[in-house]
Amino acid sequence: MGDEKDSWKVKTLDEILQEKKRRKEQEEKAEIKRLKNSDDRDSKRDSLEEGELRDHCMEITIRNSPYRREDSMEDRGEEDDSLAIKPPQQMSRKEKVHHRKDEKRKEKWKHARVKEREHERRKRHREEQDKARREWERQKRREMAREHSRRERDRLEQLERKRERERKMREQQKEQREQKERERRAEERRKEREARREVSAHHRTMREDYSDKVKASHWSRSPPRPPRERFELGDGRKPGEARPAPAQKPAQLKEEKMEERDLLSDLQDISDSERKTSSAESSSAESGSGSEEEEEEEEEEEEEGSTSEESEEEEEEEEEEEEETGSNSEEASEQSAEEVSEEEMSEDEERENENHLLVVPESRFDRDSGESEEAEEEVGEGTPQSSALTEGDYVPDSPALLPIELKQELPKYLPALQGCRSVEEFQCLNRIEEGTYGVVYRAKDKKTDEIVALKRLKMEKEKEGFPITSLREINTILKAQHPNIVTVREIVVGSNMDKIYIVMNYVEHDLKSLMETMKQPFLPGEVKTLMIQLLRGVKHLHDNWILHRDLKTSNLLLSHAGILKVGDFGLAREYGSPLKAYTPVVVTQWYRAPELLLGAKEYSTAVDMWSVGCIFGELLTQKPLFPGNSEIDQINKVFKELGTPSEKIWPGYSELPVVKKMTFSEHPYNNLRKRFGALLSDQGFDLMNKFLTYFPGRRISAEDGLKHEYFRETPLPIDPSMFPTWPAKSEQQRVKRGTSPRPPEGGLGYSQLGDDDLKETGFHLTTTNQGASAAGPGFSLKF
């Protein structure tokens, strides 16, 4: 627009007129020329050419056309006027202002359009760059992910190969150990069989010699009778009298008797070696050296699979012993028949034979009882008839030459307990805890100075025999050996049958007393570690068809190494399929499952899993989850937290005995999530709900609990060795503290725990006037 303004030029009037005149002249010349040309065309068209005919229609049309030449001239004149240069018109100020505004607006709009196009171009450029950058980053992430997955896959493959190699190596070592153990046991059995055969052959030879001697004495009884009587009365031959000829045979019999005693001592050594292998830890503590027997005993503890082989070998030994016992009993019966058939036997010889019986090795317990017999025989060798056998002291038919004589008195311990150590070999330090069916003490082995836990079994009615509860506890705890279950070392006895103790490895803490002294609760990683160990122990019990039936925090032990162990098997028992009716009065009240509270008599492993859920909540909050004051209050507390069950969520709920008799208040909602809040994640709360499911058939098992995602999310479980340590309460002065309610007891007439501690037998606390122990710290033993 600026260029157009600059090209304008103001013309004068003369210039305008001249320009107009010049244009007019040009137009006239052009018109004249056009008319001339048109006349020439008309003249040419008026005269027909040769052979051309006139078209009247066309002529008429042209002549009568509305477009005349004058009109065309006028139109051309108007066009010429529009093309003519006119003088510039004067613009007013207002028009000029408006014109400038329009120009500015157009310029601004044009500039805005240019700026917008530039902005869009830059925006498209940035978007293309961002897209390219994102694509590059995405590609980079894909490559990094592929690289990471490849490295992780390689690492896992290496780890798997390493584990496979270790597993194969362990299997090879295990096979080698089993092979060595089998060879050793086979060698021991072979030696034992050879010894038994030698003893039985020796006994058979002695019986034959004795029968021959009896027959000979029957047919020629009168001649040698007076000298024997004179010798017994002290009127025998003189000191200088010659020794009679038959003295060689009794000397030979005496040598055979000494050989028999040596063979019996060898048998006793073999039985002692078997007892040592059965109590591996005690024998290793006594030896103190790395002998082969100690290594074999430790291997036996680690190998749980070898128990089946040992049981088979023991069955074979028992069968062999029964066969030999049968053969020996047959021989003894034949011998007795021969003795009865001798009608002419003298009355003196019959009285002698009535007091003496032949020894027949029947079982290991008989061989164990032979120790006391052999000791008394050695004591009796100082008598003239046994030890003072000189050349001048010959007795023809002395009873001392007969086979070994059985003692009429019982040994100090019963045969079933032969080989058990005495409790006197332990120094009791202090009392730790009262269990379901006994009292636990902390003691020290006097030989090895090891600290152990001694649990005295509660003998409910010892006059009626060994109590079934104690027998069940010993059998269960010996069967369920596992790293997360208390380890039994041996069984020791006191002076009487009512004093039987289980020797266990000493563990420093129980979770109940530990949580009461802790200033801060367990960390989430520590709770996961404890729960994993608890579930492993419970899984091992359930895999071996064992119900614990008394899981609670006071029965869970924690060592300084962070290893959790399940203890107190006083209420444990084996179960089978199909389920049988058991007593519902089991499990401590706070940890008792709802089916037990409502009177169900058929139950299974689900009762232990409910207790595990209660322990889980107590580990998180350091408080019992359902601390009821009575069974009814316990049921109400459970229903208030979890909601009242119905037949829909618990099939068979309405058929339970307590539900038929009572009506409970309705609690429609589960309020358990509010109780834990931030202490428990969503996965943890899901696991808690599965532990505390009403219907036992839907309650989670220990095996499935170990596979739950709660143990794989962050924070992960910590290593047990990273657990903090606390001072052991059992090693300090015992203080009274709040405990969970007592478990169900053994019924009417069941004596209170710890009553025997006040008697003169068993453990007794003896102190001086100043309060110090009279015989060192702790308890002293009295019997």
Curated annotation (Swiss-Prot):
Bias (Low complexity): 279-290
Q: What else is known?
A: Duplicated gene. CDK11A and CDK11B encode almost identical protein kinases of 110 kDa that contain at their C-termini the open reading frame of a smaller 58 kDa isoform which is expressed following IRES-mediated alternative initiation of translation.
PTM note says: During apoptosis, induced by Fas or tumor necrosis factor, specific CKD11 p110 isoforms are cleaved by caspases to produce a protein (p110C) that contains the C-terminal kinase domain of the CDK11 proteins.
GO CC terms, sorted: cyclin-dependent protein kinase holoenzyme complex; cytoplasm; nucleus
Class of enzymatic activity (EC top level): transferase
Phosphoserine (modified residue): where? S47, S72, S271, S470, S577, S740
Q: Which Pfam families match?
A: Pkinase (PF00069)
Needed cofactors, names only, are: Mg(2+)
Query: Is the ATP-binding keyword given for this protein?
Result: yes
Its recorded name reads: Cyclin-dependent kinase 11A
Q: Where, per the database record, does this protein carry Phosphotyrosine?
A: Y582
Q: What is its EC number?
A: 2.7.11.22
**GO MF annotation: an example:** protein serine kinase activity
Q: Which residues carry this modification: Phosphothreonine?
A: T476, T583, T739
In residue numbers, the region (Disordered) covers 18-396, 721-783
Family the UniProt entry places it in = Belongs to the protein kinase superfamily. CMGC Ser/Thr protein kinase family. CDC2/CDKX subfamily.
Q: Which organism is it from?
A: Homo sapiens
Q: According to the UniProt entry, which residue ranges have a biased composition of type Basic residues?
A: 95-125
UniProt subcellular location = Cytoplasm; Nucleus
Gene from which this protein is expressed: CDK11A
Q: Which UniProt keywords apply?
A: Apoptosis, ATP-binding, Cell cycle, Cytoplasm, Kinase, Nucleotide-binding, Nucleus, Phosphoprotein, Serine/threonine-protein kinase, Transferase
Stretches with biased composition (Acidic residues)? 291-352, 371-380
GO biological-process terms attached to the record: apoptotic process; mitotic cell cycle; protein phosphorylation; regulation of apoptotic process; regulation of cell cycle; regulation of cell growth; regulation of centrosome cycle; regulation of DNA-templated transcription
* Functional description taken from the UniProt entry: Appears to play multiple roles in cell cycle progression, cytokinesis and apoptosis. The p110 isoforms have been suggested to be involved in pre-mRNA splicing, potentially by phosphorylating the splicing protein SFRS7. The p58 isoform may act as a negative regulator of normal cell cycle progression.
How the protein assembles, per its UniProt entry?
A: The cleaved p110 isoform, p110C, binds to the serine/threonine kinase PAK1. The p58 isoform but not the p110 isoform or p110C interacts with CCND3. The p110 isoforms are found in large molecular weight complexes containing CCNL1 and SFRS7.
Annotated binding of ATP, by residue: I432, E433, E434, G435, T436, Y437, G438, V439, V440, K455
